[in-house]
Amino acid sequence: MPGRKARRNAPVNPTRAELPPEFAAQLRKIGDKVYCTWSAPDITVVLAQMPGKSQKSRMRSPSPTRVPADLKDECAQLRRIGDKVNLRQKLLNLISKLFNLVT
């Protein structure tokens, strides 16, 4: 907007406390494990090693799979829809060929 000025960045605090070396080493070790392996069981083990952190949520089980009969019904329904769309497209192509005889 024309009447507004951009905000300045926050000033850098030179007295900011640095992490003690043992905490930095532990964070580095945890980060290496997380980024190298990246699978759910390993992550839960790594998170369990972090002091003072509790696990917020458990891993959910995957959604239940469909019954094969439902899949067959859905497949048949999709085929019927595809057949109708295919028939409509063929009719449109035929009509466009009949009315657009300019070659």
Curated annotation (Swiss-Prot):
Where does this polypeptide localize?
A: Mitochondrion
Q: Give the induction note.
A: Up-regulated after exposure to ionizing radiation and other genotoxic agents. Up-regulation is mediated by p53.
Q: Disulfide connectivity?
A: none
- Coiled-coil parts of chain: none
Q: How does it assemble?
A: Interacts with MCL1. Interacts with BCL2A1. Interacts with BAX. Interacts with BCL2L10.
Q: What functional role does this protein have?
A: Promotes activation of caspases and apoptosis. Promotes mitochondrial membrane changes and efflux of apoptogenic proteins from the mitochondria. Contributes to p53/TP53-dependent apoptosis after radiation exposure. Promotes proteasomal degradation of MCL1. Competes with BIM/BCL2L11 for binding to MCL1 and can displace BIM/BCL2L11 from its binding site on MCL1. Competes with BAK1 for binding to MCL1 and can displace BAK1 from its binding site on MCL1.
Put simply, this protein is called Phorbol-12-myristate-13-acetate-induced protein 1
Species, as recorded: Mus musculus (Mouse)
Query: Its encoding gene is what?
Result: Pmaip1
